[in-house]
């Protein structure tokens, strides 16, 4: 039911920090353009080989906050955003001249893996105060959280329904993300502008690069996002997602009577169900 309380939670946490965090006069929010697709669905396989990905210019100007603050990201990076009637798609081509050194550890959802990682932040309210964060590492480990009060508050207990697929190849690695419209909150305007930010971590270099770039000396998060333009006719989401699951379990115990056919030493159980979020 966490998705249902998202609007209330974000409004509450917005009051935890000063209403206005000073923004550097040098900061000008860059524009990211997206387009609507729909003739053929995006296949979430982590390969970015659908022609639709070429419909938009990639974001490439990520700059380091560590270790060389302000320098261009050391490995070329291209990020694109598409959307359709059901979801927002983020595709990232993360080039690496030494793909064999890409760090990709497995872990549970929301765990810190100390791996390479790609992250997208979205301020779908475009209030410059609140955002949602989606991250994935090359092994496909996902993370997500709410961001409030312009970066003063975060909540990892938020677990929306979304998907990600990754691939490591001779050029580096790719991340393909699908975020259902139902998991985001936005206005009813026909045409919209959202806030967006991209982040790449190259773990072996202790490197973190951002778009848009914000110096470490400046506070704030959503107030420093770029502007995502091109969104139109999103409609009113139904705020409902069903996530099927299956469970299996096996037991072994010492029976009281080994000859009793109705009391076997082993037993197996299976069940299934749906996680409902609205």
Say what each PLM segment does.
Residues 2, 11-278:
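Structural preference for beta-rich elements and adjacent junctions enriched in aromatics
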